[in-house]
Amino acid sequence: MLNKKIKKNHKEDWITELTNAITNPDELLRTLNLKSNTKYFKNIQVQKLFSLRVPKTFVSRMKKNDPFDPLLLQILPHTKELKNNHNFVQDPLEETKNVIIPGLIRKYNNRILLLLKTNCAINCRYCFRRYFPYSQHPGNKENLNLAIQYIKNQTDLNEVILSGGDPLMAKDHEIQWIVNTLSNIYHIKRLRIHTRLPIVIPSRITNNLCKILSTTRLKILIVTHINHAQEINHELQYNINKLHKLGITLLNQSVLLRGINDNAKILSQLSNKLFDINILPYYLHILDKVKSTTHFYVSEKQASIIVVELLSMISGFLVPKLVCEHPGKNSKIYINLNMK
């Protein structure tokens, strides 16, 4: 159980924290008392593939003097990213084929993805959209208005998923606009927000954002992205609790990552800590086979073994659903655990 004595004077200047993010690998390693090592970042090619970006609030949860820290391994550029495998491609889910208009992706029957923002507060090395052509999908007013018009015309839709990038990179007044606009479309019942920003910068959960999300007729769901229990600290607990008190549904999805969270003990710690802060474990994803991420991949067979062991360690409602996603399918695919 996390310590309940949490400071009440948390600042809300998340934009300052965003601006002060670390983008230089040398600075990051110095902060963590680690020596520069060419295999991590010296290869300019790796940096060009996908630059480093990590807020200091997230770095503060990393263990110093530990090159294998599970939070560090998620964000530090590594020459392993140059390893080629023909099964790992730039668009593993073929999302570009499902683009309706710039920034609007329809993969499912009753719900639609709106890419509200094209950037993130943190660059996770395993990101399945690390090669997504965001420059072709600017989140400007023109594209947003086209997206809204499409959603209005599609009466079979009842849920909008805000994605990105990270949708909470939008400022509060922008969130207010999209919430108000969608709430005026009678057939839209739910608004789901997929985000990692409050995890890495908890102060993003401003009082104003809470007010916006609690004064709409839409049912609000927030799906966080947390992969390891070490990511959860007192500041995150305090800010997540503000959302919980408003009755907002809080779910979490994780990615199974080799060398980071690929064992049942680590996953059990994560599930327990998530529930301690009122977030329900929802999905455990097999890594999408995006180029430059082969070193993170855990096979479906090994993942099944891990989850079967996890079932014996924690209550069933704390066990996330093991899933993968295939291009062309209109839903996630549940992985068979082969239990006898």
From Swiss-Prot:
Which GO MF terms does the UniProt record name?
A: 4 iron, 4 sulfur cluster binding; isomerase activity; metal ion binding
Q: Name one Pfam family in it.
A: Fer4_12
EC class: isomerase
Q: Which InterPro entries match?
A: Aldolase_TIM, EpmB, Lys_aminomutase/Glu_NH3_mut, rSAM
Q: Which residues carry this modification: N6-(pyridoxal phosphate)lysine?
A: K332
Asked if Metal-binding is a keyword of the record, the answer is: yes
Per the UniProt record, which EC number(s) apply here? Answer: 5.4.3.-
Radical SAM core domain location, by residue? 106-321
The catalysed reaction is: L-lysine = D-beta-lysine
List the cofactors.
[4Fe-4S] cluster; pyridoxal 5'-phosphate
Q: Which residues of the sequence carry a binding annotation for [4Fe-4S] cluster?
A: C120, C124, C127
Q: Does the keyword Iron-sulfur apply?
A: yes
Keywords (A to Z) from UniProt: 4Fe-4S, Iron, Iron-sulfur, Isomerase, Metal-binding, Pyridoxal phosphate, S-adenosyl-L-methionine
Entry cofactor note text? Binds 1 [4Fe-4S] cluster. The cluster is coordinated with 3 cysteines and an exchangeable S-adenosyl-L-methionine.
Entry similarity comment = Belongs to the radical SAM superfamily. KamA family.
Function of the protein: With EpmA is involved in the beta-lysylation step of the post-translational modification of translation elongation factor P (EF-P) on 'Lys-34'. EpmB appears to act before EpmA. Displays lysine 2,3-aminomutase activity, producing (R)-beta-lysine from (S)-alpha-lysine (L-lysine).
Instruction: Tell me which PANTHER family the record gives.
Output: L-LYSINE 2,3-AMINOMUTASE (PTHR30538:SF1), LYSINE 2,3-AMINOMUTASE-RELATED (PTHR30538)
Q: What is this protein called?
A: L-lysine 2,3-aminomutase
Organism this protein belongs to: Buchnera aphidicola subsp. Baizongia pistaciae (strain Bp)
